[in-house]
Structure formats: structure tokens, C-alpha cells
Amino acid sequence: MLRSMLTASTTLNQLQQQIDTISSNLSNSNTTGYKAKDTNFSELVRQQFDQVDEKNEEVAKARKTPPGLRLGVGAMMSSRLVSDQGSIQKTDRDLDIAFTSPYQYLQVNVNGNRQYTRDGALYVTPSAANANQLQLVTGNGYPVLDENGNTVNIDSSMKNITINKNGTLTASDGNAVQRFNLGVVQVNNPQELKSEGNNLFSIDNAAAFEELNGANRQNIGMQQGSLEMSNVDISEQMTDLITSQRSYQLNSRTITMGDQMLGLINSVR
């Protein structure tokens, strides 16, 4: 009984993590540029009990199954980032951009640290360093970086802003022109991305991404006046949620039954 209760308890913890992941996916189904996480389970190391007669050749030949008794000790959940391209929704807003390549991310400054996002809903806010300039930021107020790692500061006199498919922002007032190459990276291994919340990611392994500068900027796929929607499949997430809830109930029932059996043993006189 104790073994079954411990096994169920281990699995319950992993199932709760799966439910939390699914809940996060569903709550972000309308978040711009959000990438869903997929979950799966694998069996933990099994414990084997050998039998006394397992080395007996006659017994071994007569068996239809492998010798010994193998008992599981629970399951472990793992998750991976789903990097599939989300649908593109046209907004006709000059500061909205959508990546058309599934592995490219915009560089932003988060409290002095460089992080990455696919949320292309951008805004301008008065620059703290220069009253005559506007700073390009994300919806959460994080400064967008250019290809050199500097913030994008646009003169407040500029009225027209265009962003081409290679990530070059051009601002003009009819006479003067400013150009900025937005900082974009190509992620070679999306599983190296570490979620930091607020639709942001960090990367510890420098070999997992490549900065698209110089001639490589022609590989950037960006569309102005559009936003990439979340790639969450709601029907799939709801199906997984129901399945995980049923598994949670079954494992909870296992613990309850084990407790009842222990209670019966304690009541024996």
C-alpha cells in the first residue's frame, strides 16, 4: 500500500505541473506572439525484484514474460517550447510588426539584461535622456534594441515611420530621415530559450542563437502593420486538460484506497 501511495504521490506532483502548463497556454491564447508549451510524460526508473528460480533454464524457457518483477515508481513530466508560426493578423498600425519566420526574435533591454520576444506590438514613449526624442519600447515598456545593442531613440519631430521586411526602421518628417536596424536574432535551438515571463525569453548558451547583422539581415522576415497571434491550439489544450484531470483523480483515488487499506490493517486486533 505504501508503495502505491508513494508512486501516486510522485505522479500527482507531475500532473499538477502539466495542468499549470496547460492553464498558462489557455490564458495566453490571445497574447501576441505567445509560444505554447507541449508536455509529455516518461516513466521513472523501475525497480526490479529477481526471482530465485530465474536462472533455471527450464523455467526460463517456459516463461512467456521476462524473469523478475518490475515495479514502477511514478512518471516524470517534461515540456518543450512549440515554435510553430502563429497566424498573422493585419492591424494597419505603423508600429505593429510580425515575424514571418518562426525562429526569429526581437532584442529588448530588461533592467540592463538583453532578452528576446516575438511580441511585435511596439510603442514610443518620451525618452528620459532627451526631451526631444521618443524611445521605441514594447507593450510592457522595455526598450527595443538596435543591431548594436543600443536603444532606438527617434526625434520627436518625426511623423512617418516605416519598417521594412529586413527589420530596418525609417523615420522621417518630410525633410530629415533617421534609420535604425532593429536587433534581431535567429534561434538555432528553441529549447535553449528560458521563459522569463511577460512573453520574454533569455538564452544562456551563446551558441544557440545568431545575431542577424550585416548581410545576414536579408534573412529577416518581418511584416509591418501586422501582429503574430498565439500558436496555442485551444481544442488540443482542452483535450489535454481533461485527460490530465482524469489522471489526477485516478492517482488521488489510489492514495485514498491505500489509506483505507492501512486503516483496516490498524483495526485488526
From Swiss-Prot:
Pfam family, one: LlgE_F_G_D1
Coiled coil residues, start to end: 7-65
Signal peptide range: none
UniProt-listed GO biological process terms: bacterial-type flagellum organization; bacterial-type flagellum-dependent swarming motility
Entry GO CC: bacterial-type flagellum
The entry's keywords: Bacterial flagellum biogenesis, Coiled coil
Family annotation (NCBIfam families): FlgEFG_subfam (TIGR03506)
Family of the protein in this entry: Belongs to the flagella basal body rod proteins family.
Protein name: Flagellar hook-basal body complex protein FlhP
Provenance organism: Bacillus subtilis (strain 168)
